[in-house]
């Protein structure tokens, strides 16, 4: 008798993706971040759906509706904080997932990597629009500042900004369309994640050594299902701890003040996961230059495969490249810190140096070091 999971048209897809999938026997916990990302997306869609049942996307009532969710709706406070902190967890997993890809050379799977970069942009757009919805001070001014950056685009800039705003300032039309886009984008992200997996399963997973693992494969279930469950449980533990003990730790106190177009907050800053890009934006005194640097800070990921000069795929056996990778991580942490600081000495110069180092490491130092390592190994 044939097994249903191997013959049924729908079950067959799931079987080939999560049960009988041949996986390398030596993949480390750094390969675990795909499943927590999937769980994060499911948590965000479910909590978001319940929030949308009570939220109103009108400038007069948006702030009050969020207050109503927290005070009057059964476990509304829990749903709201799970959604807000779930986004932070999502980005932590995303950054670790991308970092793993860079360290172990997973970017050599071009389609998978490029869809991953597209996914990163989509998730960032979703998070930005979600931050605007509570209509607090930082929501309003964050939306104003970030959308205004598009005015730096020559010729069509100012028209484009007014088109996005739906008027001459961030107002009711902006809030309504941001809510609509914030609702639809996670489903687009889910579809892209499916395509991401599709292309990954065409090639099979990479592994820490960067060598072909065709000679030594094991089934995904039970080995990696149980391993992934551990990662997911740790994610849920971290998320629930954050939500139940310190839900406002990563938020901005300014967002507990209703939006007021007549009163600018002293320090306008985005959520913590955008601070590195915000620091790069602020480090360039020219508006258009800043916007280009901001976009390139993420888009540079797409050209990393073109800059791969090493004859080895992974950094596992390349100590100099490892050193540069960890300097890059430290640089990104520095940029995140600078993004949250006021624009004054010494933060300005630190931000500028960290921004230069970020691009210099990726575009110049890492490719040159890879060539040097090739020569050291007489390759």
UniProtKB/Swiss-Prot annotation:
Pfam families noted in UniProt: Cytochrom_B_C, Cytochrome_B
Cofactor: heme b
Transmembrane segments: 33-53, 77-98, 113-133, 178-198, 226-246, 288-308, 320-340, 347-367
Membrane topology (UniProt): Multi-pass membrane protein
InterPro entries: Cyt_b/b6_C, Cyt_b/b6_C_sf, Cyt_b/b6_N, Cytb/b6-like_sf, Cytochrome_b, Cytochrome_b_C_euk/bac, Cytochrome_b_N_euk/bac, Di-haem_cyt_TM
Keywords, in A-Z order: Electron transport, Heme, Iron, Membrane, Metal-binding, Mitochondrion, Mitochondrion inner membrane, Respiratory chain, Transmembrane, Transmembrane helix, Transport, Ubiquinone
Binding site residues for heme b b566: 97, 196
CDD domains membership: cytochrome_b_C (cd00290), Cytochrome_b_N (cd00284)
GO molecular function list: metal ion binding; ubiquinol-cytochrome-c reductase activity
Domain of life assignment: Eukaryota
Residues binding heme b b562: 83, 182
Cellular compartments annotated: Mitochondrion inner membrane
Single Gene Ontology BP annotation: mitochondrial electron transport, ubiquinol to cytochrome c
Cofactor: how bound: Binds 2 heme b groups non-covalently.
GO cellular component: mitochondrial inner membrane; respiratory chain complex III
Residues that coordinate or bind a ubiquinone: 201
Misc remark: Heme 1 (or BL or b562) is low-potential and absorbs at about 562 nm, and heme 2 (or BH or b566) is high-potential and absorbs at about 566 nm.
Protein family (similarity comment): Belongs to the cytochrome b family.
Assembly notes: The cytochrome bc1 complex contains 11 subunits: 3 respiratory subunits (MT-CYB, CYC1 and UQCRFS1), 2 core proteins (UQCRC1 and UQCRC2) and 6 low-molecular weight proteins (UQCRH/QCR6, UQCRB/QCR7, UQCRQ/QCR8, UQCR10/QCR9, UQCR11/QCR10 and a cleavage product of UQCRFS1). This cytochrome bc1 complex then forms a dimer.
Function: Component of the ubiquinol-cytochrome c reductase complex (complex III or cytochrome b-c1 complex) that is part of the mitochondrial respiratory chain. The b-c1 complex mediates electron transfer from ubiquinol to cytochrome c. Contributes to the generation of a proton gradient across the mitochondrial membrane that is then used for ATP synthesis.
Protein name: Cytochrome b
């Amino acid at each position: 008798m044939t097994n249903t999971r191997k013959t049924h048209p729908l079950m067959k897809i799931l079987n080939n993706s999560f049960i009988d999938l041949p996986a390398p026997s030596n993949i480390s916990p750094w390969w675990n971040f795909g499943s927590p990302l999937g769980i994060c997306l499911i948590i965000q869609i479910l909590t978001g759906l319940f929030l949308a049942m009570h939220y109103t996307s009108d400038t007069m009532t948006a702030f009050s509706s969020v207050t109503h969710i927290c005070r009057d709706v059964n476990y509304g406070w829990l749903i709201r904080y799970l959604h807000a902190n779930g986004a932070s967890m999502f980005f932590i997993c995303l950054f670790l997932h991308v970092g793993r890809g860079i360290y172990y050379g997973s970017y050599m799977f071009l389609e998978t990597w490029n869809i991953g970069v597209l996914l990163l942009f989509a998730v960032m757009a979703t998070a930005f629009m979600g931050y605007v919805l509570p209509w607090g001070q930082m929501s309003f001014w964050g939306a104003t500042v970030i959308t205004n950056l598009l005015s730096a685009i020559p010729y069509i800039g100012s028209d484009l900004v007014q088109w996005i705003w739906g008027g001459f300032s961030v107002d009711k039309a902006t809030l309504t369309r941001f809510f609509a886009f914030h609702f639809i984008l996670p489903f687009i992200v889910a579809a892209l994640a499916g395509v991401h997996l599709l292309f990954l399963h065409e090639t099979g997973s990479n592994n820490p050594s960067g060598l072909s693992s065709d000679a030594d494969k094991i089934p995904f279930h039970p080995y990696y299902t149980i391993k992934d469950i551990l990662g997911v449980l740790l994610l849920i533990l971290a998320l629930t701890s954050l939500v139940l003990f310190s839900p406002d730790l990563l938020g901005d106190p300014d967002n507990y003040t209703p939006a007021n177009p007549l009163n600018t907050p002293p320090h306008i800053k985005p959520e913590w996961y955008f601070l590195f890009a915000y620091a790069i934006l602020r480090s360039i005194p020219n508006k258009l230059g800043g916007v280009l640097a901001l976009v390139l800070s993420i888009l540079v990921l797409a050209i990393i495969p073109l800059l791969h000069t090493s004859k080895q795929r992974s950094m596992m056996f390349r100590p100099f490249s490892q050193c540069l990778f960890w300097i890059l991580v430290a640089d990104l942490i520095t940029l995140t810190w600078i993004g949250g600081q006021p624009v004054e000495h010494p933060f300005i110069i630190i931000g500028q140096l960290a921004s230069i180092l970020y691009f210099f490491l990726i575009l110049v130092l890492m490719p040159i070091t890879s060539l040097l390592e090739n020569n050291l190994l007489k390759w």
